[in-house]
Amino acid sequence: MKDMNENQTFNPLALDNQICFALYVCSKEIIRKYTPLLEPLGLTYTSYITLLSLWEKDNVTVKELGSRLFLDSGTLTPLLKKMEGQGLITRTRGGKDERTVFIQLTKDGKAIKKKCADIPQQMMCQNILDMKKAEPLLQTLHQIMYNMANAPV
């Protein structure tokens, strides 16, 4: 938001005053910065965050993974099919309930973690934001994510 002097009034319809626009541009640009780091590994940003989640907790249902990543099944299903084709994950139907699909990392899915280990540091080296400012921003963004996920439609 731009600073205003005493003679100006806040314009709620000004593009520069839109939090959603600032978040959109930052998200788009950060993903653009990730692309040259991920492409050599055959990953997209979405497949990368999927792996990050699975490295934390493997053998989860598609529903759990979608909730964790804030992705709907229309986005997640083709992504998981592609990742399975790359040999990074397997999809297994539940024994008792055939509708439940479990996602597990393969040996390759676990091994690629080592190749991704320096990506966060490489991103920090691009001087996007120093750690002192990143921590409170991350807390604020998590609060926004929580609020949005729990807000009535």
Report each predicted region and the residues it spans.
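Alpha-helical linker/hinge and terminal dimerization helices associated
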Residues: C26, I30-K33, L69, I112-D130, ...
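Charged, amphipathic alpha-helical coiled-coil/dimerization segments
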Residues: K81-Q139
